[in-house]
Amino acid sequence: PTRVGASCVLVAIGIVPSTSLAESAGLDIDDGVLVDRAQRTSNPAIFAVGDAARHRTADGMLLRRHEHWESAMNHGRTAAAALLGVDLPKLGSSWFWSDRYGVHVEGVGSMLAPGRDVVRAVDGIPQVAFRVSDDNLLVGCAAIDDSHAVRAARRIIDRKIVVDDDALADPTISLKGKSFRTR
């Protein structure tokens, strides 16, 4: 074995979906196994769930894969409902979290959706970033060491509550307050 002295090591494994089985079955592949809202692949008798599943919307737009345990669980619930012929479950916005070097990072929704960024700083340090659509709906949130903000943002996103940029940016205004109730 070779030893290398280092004060810090960065391991960047990356996530590449294993799609060879799906590809050999003739399924549509593009950075994952392409599925519809019900988790059906291009072969309607085959479903795909979990990290390798990538949604294609009804209009053909490809969404990113959601590599998170909650997404895998929700994919299974959705596929089961489709197989049973019952209504598909209503699911919340996609969510993730990670702890890195003593920092807790969380995100919900999409920070890449069309719109503008609003930043909430505490003591001059940016802590929460929001993505707001042109029609003033919250569509994404990312936070450092503030899981309460992300949970509140998820509720706001899922309920399609119209938001105010100044209220989002103000750390003295609770995201659970009356400023953020459905109108």
Q: Predicted segments — roles?
A:
Residues P1, I13, D51, V108-A113, ...:
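Short, positively charged
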Residues T2-T78:
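FAD-site-proximal beta/loop scaffold in flavoenzymes
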Residues G26-L27, L84, D158:
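A generic structural signal for secondary-structure junctions
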Residues A52-H148, R155:
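Mid-to-C-terminal Rossmann-like scaffold of FAD/NAD(P)H-dependent oxidoreductases
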Residues S147-D165:
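A short, polar/charged loop-to-alpha-helix boundary motif
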Residues V162-R183:
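Cysteine/selenocysteine-centered motifs that mediate thiol-based redox chemistry or coordinate metal-sulfur cofactors
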